[in-house]
Amino acid sequence: MSALDAYKIRQDFAILDQVVNDEPLVYLDNAATTQKPQVVLDTLMAYYHEDNANVHRGVHTLAERATAAYEASREKLRQFINAKSTKEVLFTRGTTTGLNWVGRFAEQVLEPGDEVVISIMEHHSNIIPWQEACKKTGAKLVYAYLKDGQLDMEDLANKITEKTKFVSLAQVSNVLGCINPVKEIAKLAHQVGAYMVVDGAQSAPHMAIDVQDLDCDFFPLSGHKMLGPTGIGVLYGKEEILNQMNPIEFGGEMIDFVYEQEATWKELPWKFEAGTPNIAGAIALGAAVDYLSALGMENIHAYEQELVDYVLPKLQAIDGLTVYGPEDSSQHAGVIAFNIDGLHPHDVATALDYEGVAVRAGHHCAQPLINHLGISSAARASFYIYNTKEDCDKLVEAIFATKEFFNGTL
């Protein structure tokens, strides 16, 4: 029996209590973005209603309240991922921004002949920054491939060599749903003196994260995938590495002193936070972290595993339906990509929407993986704390209805 009560949790999400196409909404697009509990919405409005002021600039009461709330949120995020210090917690726009910042750091340190190792399952945000860094420095981008719907660890280990300077991998694939052993991989990277980057976009919302235990050098995450607002995220980096990194943007409040011909930078973390930040978003992300922490990340992970254990075998049993990723539900996170023989994924997603079921269809910002799988796109259902086994049943029923509809029209 799960420690989570999804029916009680749903009461905090008014958006879920609606009808779509004459059917109760079943929201299964959580890998794209999650819904927001009322406390997060209230926190956003409270900032604008009561404390709207810029941070780290004024000495008046509103500015000091806003600054205190902003920095309190940073501390909440530090605890959430177990960073050593708030100096290691940089506010960003999201995972994409964080990975781009790491890519800019790579441009500082890569040299011709160096190698960056990623996997074929990566999101474009964990591919293109490395492509650009390698183009600019003469380094080589190396891919590890798949075995049985998961990362081929033997292939990865063979690709990590003395030439490797960065290893960058998603902890959880946003298509395959597989959970990569990033702690083990970090050891392989560090054995050859490489930096380890863990894309936490699909893991931080769903499982307990301890960056010190993982021993990763960087860990970006997105707030909107973990009940927070859009446009806010975090890049974790080890303090000693962040001190080596050049600032990415320049301007207000990231400077210590500006002379006519040069300038000096503030200490961490502020040297990376130029200009007015997303103050409301950062504070509301802190409220989202409070909400998740109260539920317990271990409980969240266990509950989502219950849902996957329940629905994955049902999907695998449907004739003509292919599920991508690990066959064993115990190795599968709450992200399930699938195709139905003879049907385009966009048609499938549209038909499911007629049944009130919201899923995503497309290449999921992972075109190299999609090409590697030999398909053009896929439908994807993804689960979170407010989904229920009834939602799983509705997904399966809607897939059967979709198959029946198209079989009658083909």
Question: What name fits each language-model region?
Answer:
Residues 1-410:
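Pyridoxal 5′-phosphate
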